[in-house]
A protein has these predicted regions:
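Conserved NTP-donor binding/palm subdomain of two-metal-ion nucleotidyltransferases/polymerases, i.e.
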Residues: 1-202
Length: 202
């Protein structure tokens, strides 16, 4: 709805550069939030900022990113893009983030979807509570996958049961459970997601 008629075109609409960048980052954030995303997105960020970074209205961009809950996400990813493309020195956080994105492949992996949910409910050091969170998620989380829970929170135990049966029958769910047993990976992933502060408004 923010597209405007393209100059010299009768039937073509396009985003302003500012809105295109916000769309690009929000699309990346959506994938990162749900399944993780690959390093190809970093190339997009780097190329755009090299080409248009000095001419776009950065204040407008940051206001829109803040509304979407992804301003800090964009700042961290822009920094990582510079680190990678220009071979800059960086902290361990960016090394871990880059390795995670490489492992995600191009489109991410379904088993990565659990990290954003665990991060919402646990601090990085709260490893002892992740089992409870993973096997018995909050009603808010469960409603995303079981819409019939809306207004019927008393049926939450039934939804947990359905989720458990689904987990036993699907390979991705079993892989997630195995991954969560790796204490070092759990700590690293919690640090990544907390530092990105990804409060993505879906």
């Amino acid at each position: 709805f923010r597209a405007v008629p393209a100059e010299g075109k009768k039937y073509t609409y396009e985003f302003s550069r500012e809105n295109f960048y916000v769309y690009m980052i929000s699309h990346m954030a959506k994938h990162f939030y749900e399944n993780g995303c690959g390093i190809r997105n970093l190339v997009d960020i780097y190329v755009f900022n090299q080409k248009y970074g000095h001419s776009i209205d950065r204040t407008q961009v940051e206001q829109e990113l803040k509304k979407c809950g992804i301003l800090n996400f964009e700042r961290q990813m822009s920094e990582l893009a510079l680190i990678w493309m220009e071979n800059r020195k960086c902290s361990k956080f960016y090394v871990n983030l880059f390795r995670y994105m490489i492992d995600c492949g191009i489109y991410g992996k379904s088993e990565n979807g659990i990290w954003s949910q665990l991060c919402k409910q646990n601090a990085p050091q709260q490893k002892k509570s992740f089992n409870l969170t993973y096997y018995f998620p909050t009603a808010q989380y469960m409603k995303e996958y079981y819409p019939w829970l809306e207004g019927k929170e008393g049926l939450l135990p039934l939804a947990w049961l359905c989720r458990g049966v689904h987990g036993l029958l699907h390979r991705d769910s079993m892989e997630r459970a195995r991954t969560l047993k790796d204490r070092e990976k759990y700590r690293m992933m919690m640090e990544i997601y907390h530092n990105l502060n990804l409060n993505f408004v879906k």
